[in-house]
Structure formats: C-alpha cells, structure tokens
C-alpha cells in the first residue's frame, strides 16, 4: 500500500511568469490609415526542461503575425513559462503533460499578454480563440506513429 502512495500522480503549479515579450510594428504608421482586414498567422511551440527532481519548466512560445498584402503590420511573440512539480507519471503521460496540459494552463496568460501588446501598438483589438492543445498533441503522436517506420525524423 505504501508503494502505491509513493507512485501517485502529483501536479502542482509553482510559478507562472512571462519569460520574453517582443512586439514589432515595422510598417507603422502606414497601416493606421488603411482598412484593417489583416491575415493573422498564429504559431505555437513548447519546450520543457528539468530544473530539479520532479520540478520542470515548461515554456509556451506564441507568435502572432498580422499582414496586409505583402507587408507585416505587426509581429508579437510571447514566451509564457511555468514551473511545475510533476511526479508519478512518465513516458507518454509526461509528454502529454509537457505538450498539452501545461500549455493549456499557460495559454490564457500568453493570450492576455499578446492582446495587451497589440492594444499598446494601437492596433484594433485581437481576440485569439482558445487552442485545443490536447488535439494538437494527439495529431503530433499520430504523425510520429505514421512516420516512425517510413521516414527519418524531421526538425520542426
């Protein structure tokens, strides 16, 4: 019974913080006088590292690029990070925690930071929809399974 208690899954948020923020409006004020119908591109990436036994940093990088025609109106990148205590899981469950569960926690903070930066750049309000990191993680696993025997690993 005591072995079972030692192997129970534990998850705790230690800290959530903004690691890096960048906002660029390379063609301002050109776009302030045009009709605002940009193409918005959203890029997401995650990284994790072990800080101590059962303590991990997970970083969610969110990049939003708004373009009108060929020109970039703005580019905003936020690295939202968290320090988490995670124990009692491994393998695919740990990968899911790093690739989906923690990013689901971090994304609302990153979204708020991006919205604030875009507003400070005096661009119209940007509302980013929630992201289903669980579905993205499942797609990633499926791609890994599909390509495991037929292709060498590719850099993202």
UniProtKB/Swiss-Prot annotation:
Predominant cellular place of this UniProt entry's protein: cytoplasm
One Pfam family here: SecB
Keyword Magnesium recorded: no
Function statement: One of the proteins required for the normal export of preproteins out of the cell cytoplasm. It is a molecular chaperone that binds to a subset of precursor proteins, maintaining them in a translocation-competent state. It also specifically binds to its receptor SecA.
BP terms from Gene Ontology: protein folding; protein tetramerization; protein transport
Database matches in InterPro entries: SecB, SecB-like_sf
GO MF term set: unfolded protein binding
Compartment(s) where it occurs, according to its Swiss-Prot or TrEMBL record: Cytoplasm
Record text on subunit structure and interactions: Homotetramer, a dimer of dimers. One homotetramer interacts with 1 SecA dimer.
This protein's name: Protein-export protein SecB
Family, as annotated: Belongs to the SecB family.
Lineage top rank: taxon: Bacteria
Keywords in alphabetical order: Chaperone, Cytoplasm, Protein transport, Translocation, Transport
NCBIfam families per record: PRK05751.1-1, PRK05751.1-4, secB
GO cellular component terms, semicolon-separated: cytoplasm
